[in-house]
């Protein structure tokens, strides 16, 4: 198992400086992580720095609330890809899901999938705000809308991934769709537990600590 290729090396804090982003990029190149996950303002800088490597630039869409309109999310997606993003992580319309407005949730996801035009799309459910029934429904809608992955969390709400949620998501989507655990992986043991539960990608700021077999401080 190539653990490094499970990791989306992440820095989404609004106060992140160019120096910190550059450090993230250099670490990702050293460890050959799957991607770095950075805010859209850093796409072009990151894409330039990562030229010649296998590390992709992953960008959040409708982040962190998921409450933008579908048109805005679609524009963000096209803009991100045009600027060099190789993957996008969109946040669902959580309020619509809570309201059982499933058509809107599905249309919202589909708008991003269509705008991505083949670029990998991960759908953030924000599991800490959902019941198990809502988590299952969100997974089904993401799958129906043609997304590539379902993802637990933004890291900006009340909690991150749990092993139980990852297992539920994997059980719901079956073997062929990706599942990303984000927030909560602070050590090698954490990462392994998520992978054993069914995760195929892990979003974390602790990628280096995980690879070194250490435990990182912080909460994402």
Swiss-Prot record:
EC code: 4.1.2.4
A Gene Ontology BP annotation from the UniProt entry: carbohydrate catabolic process
Group of enzyme by EC: lyase
Pathway(s): Carbohydrate degradation; 2-deoxy-D-ribose 1-phosphate degradation; D-glyceraldehyde 3-phosphate and acetaldehyde from 2-deoxy-alpha-D-ribose 1-phosphate: step 2/2
Secretion signal, residue range per the UniProt entry: none
Residues at the active site: 89 (proton donor/acceptor), 151 (schiff-base intermediate with acetaldehyde), 180 (proton donor/acceptor)
Compartment annotation: Cytoplasm
GO CC annotation terms, alphabetical: cytoplasm
Listed InterPro entries: Aldolase_TIM (IPR013785), DeoC (IPR011343), DeoC/FbaB/LacD_aldolase (IPR002915), DeoC_typeI (IPR028581)
Membrane listed as a keyword: no
Gene Ontology MF, one: deoxyribose-phosphate aldolase activity
Role summary: Catalyzes a reversible aldol reaction between acetaldehyde and D-glyceraldehyde 3-phosphate to generate 2-deoxy-D-ribose 5-phosphate.
Record family assignment: Belongs to the DeoC/FbaB aldolase family. DeoC type 1 subfamily.
Protein name: Deoxyribose-phosphate aldolase
Lineage: Bacteria, Bacillati, Bacillota, Bacilli, Lactobacillales
Gene name linked to the record: deoC
């Amino acid at each position: 198992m190539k653990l490094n290729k499970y990791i989306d090396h992440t820095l989404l804090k609004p106060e992140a400086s160019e120096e910190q982003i550059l450090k993230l990029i250099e670490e990702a190149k050293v460890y050959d992580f799957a991607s770095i996950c950075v805010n859209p303002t850093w796409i072009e800088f990151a894409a330039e720095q990562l030229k010649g490597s296998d590390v992709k630039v992953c960008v959040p869409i409708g982040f962190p609330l998921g409450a933008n309109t579908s048109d805005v999310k679609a524009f963000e997606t096209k803009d991100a890809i045009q600027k060099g993003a190789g993957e996008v992580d969109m946040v669902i319309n959580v309020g619509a899901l809570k309201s059982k407005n499933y058509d809107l949730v599905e249309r919202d996801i589909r708008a991003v999938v269509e705008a991505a035009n083949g670029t990998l799309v991960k759908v953030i459910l924000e599991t800490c705000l959902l019941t198990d029934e809502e988590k299952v429904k969100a997974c089904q809608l993401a799958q129906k809308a043609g997304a590539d992955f379902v993802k637990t969390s933004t890291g900006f709400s009340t909690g991150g991934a749990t092993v139980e949620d990852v297992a539920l998501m994997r059980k719901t989507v079956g073997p062929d769709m990706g599942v990303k655990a984000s927030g909560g992986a602070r050590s090698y043991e954490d990462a392994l537990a998520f992978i054993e539960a069914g995760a195929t990608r892990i979003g974390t700021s602790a990628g280096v600590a995980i690879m070194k077999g250490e435990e990182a401080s912080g909460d994402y």
